[in-house]
């Protein structure tokens, strides 16, 4: 199984930005945590981790997932979650099961964060569970393909 993990703007600043909201782990720590999580270590999952602060690059990543025949996408679009019709449309265009993840509970924060433009294109959203949200997204994609 091939899963592309796409992180959007400012996720490269994990461990530096708003530690009270996002925690003290770095972006590299997050990627290692996902890749090495023991729950699915024996499932032979191939991960590709990508991060960009640029909306168009995120659209390109999603399109590349299609051409590289990925089975699933885990997406934390960061602030673009609330504004990007382009990312929404890219997810719809490729028809790859996509799970949206947010480290913080976006529904318990500022009102503008409660609007999710990208979520309706995804098969699910996990929010507010910290880095564990990514693990749950992987487990869900495994189950999605095993049903």
UniProtKB/Swiss-Prot annotation:
Pathway of action: Metabolic intermediate biosynthesis; chorismate biosynthesis; chorismate from D-erythrose 4-phosphate and phosphoenolpyruvate: step 3/7
Binding site for substrate: 76, 82, 89, 103-104, 113
SUPFAM superfamilies reported in the protein's UniProt record: Type II 3-dehydroquinate dehydratase
EC identifiers of the protein: 4.2.1.10
Domain of life per record: Bacteria
InterPro entries reported for this sequence: DHquinase_II, DHquinase_II_CS, DHquinase_II_sf
Similarity section: Belongs to the type-II 3-dehydroquinase family.
Protein name stated in the entry: 3-dehydroquinate dehydratase
Species annotation: Fusobacterium nucleatum subsp. nucleatum (strain ATCC 25586 / DSM 15643 / BCRC 10681 / CIP 101130 / JCM 8532 / KCTC 2640 / LMG 13131 / VPI 4355)
């Amino acid at each position: 199984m091939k899963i592309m993990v796409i992180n959007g703007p400012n996720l490269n600043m994990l461990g530096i930005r708003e530690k009270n909201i996002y925690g003290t782990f770095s972006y590299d720590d997050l990627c290692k945590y996902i890749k090495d999580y023991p729950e699915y270590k024996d499932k032979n999952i191939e991960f590709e981790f990508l991060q960009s602060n640029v909306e168009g690059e995120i659209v390109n990543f999603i399109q590349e997932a299609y051409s590289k025949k990925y089975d699933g996408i885990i997406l934390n679009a960061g602030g673009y979650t609330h504004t990007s019709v382009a990312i929404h449309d890219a997810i719809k265009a490729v028809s790859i099961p996509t799970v949206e993840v947010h480290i913080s509970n976006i529904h318990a924060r500022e009102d503008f964060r409660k609007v999710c433009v990208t979520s309706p294109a995804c098969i699910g959203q996990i929010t507010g569970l910290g880095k564990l949200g990514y693990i749950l997204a992987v487990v869900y994609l495994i189950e999605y393909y095993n049903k």
